[in-house]
Curated annotation (Swiss-Prot):
It comes from Arabidopsis thaliana. Heterohexamer of two PFD-alpha type and four PFD-beta type subunits forming prefoldin co-chaperone complex. Interacts with ABI3 (via C-terminus). Interacts with PFD6. Binds to HY5 in the nucleus and at low temperature (e.g. at 4 degrees Celsius). Interacts with LSM8, a specific subunit of the LSM2-8 complex, which is a core component of the spliceosome. Binds to HSP90 to facilitate the formation of a larger complex made at least of HSP90, PFD4 and LSM8. It holds the Pfam family Prefoldin_2. The gene is PFD4. Residues 25-59, 95-115 form a coiled coil. Disulfide bonds: none annotated. The lineage of its organism: Eukaryota, Viridiplantae, Streptophyta, Embryophyta, Tracheophyta. This is Prefoldin subunit 4.
């Protein structure tokens, strides 16, 4: 805080380090929003794969249509069940990694908030609206 005799004392000097911390916080905040979208998408995909697996159990047909790229191919039901299970496991692992990354970033953001609020007090707003 920079105080001079004729000034009110409310002026803050923003150092290069402070600006870097603010920029880092901003990037982390943007990443959290991206991760939220990715997590939501991964959860939906996991649920859809679970539903597909359940529907496949109820299917009477030995050959089912399975999407490969942009086309559907007739594939034996057992192969499709295996593939759906593999896809579900991969999606759930990906979801766990995304949630861990988000947790790590939120921890970093909390530490930066503490540092920035300690210096700037009410002069800075780092909260979501």
């Amino acid at each position: 805080m920079q105080q001079q005799g004729s000034k009110s004392g409310s002026e803050m000097e923003v150092t290069w380090e402070d600006q870097q911390n603010i920029n880092i916080f901003s990037r982390l905040n943007n990443r959290v929003h991206d991760l939220d979208d990715d997590i939501k998408s991964a959860k939906e995909k996991c649920e859809n794969l679970e539903d597909a697996g359940n529907e496949l159990i109820l299917a009477d047909e030995e050959m089912v249509r399975f999407q490969i790229g942009e086309v559907f191919a007739h594939v034996p039901r057992d192969d499709v069940e295996t593939k759906i299970e593999e896809m579900k496991e991969a999606t759930c692992k990906s979801l766990e990694k995304l949630e861990q990354e988000k947790e790590s970033i939120v921890t970093q953001m909390a530490a930066l908030k503490k540092v920035l609020y300690a210096k700037f007090k009410d002069s800075i707003n780092l909260e979501e609206d």
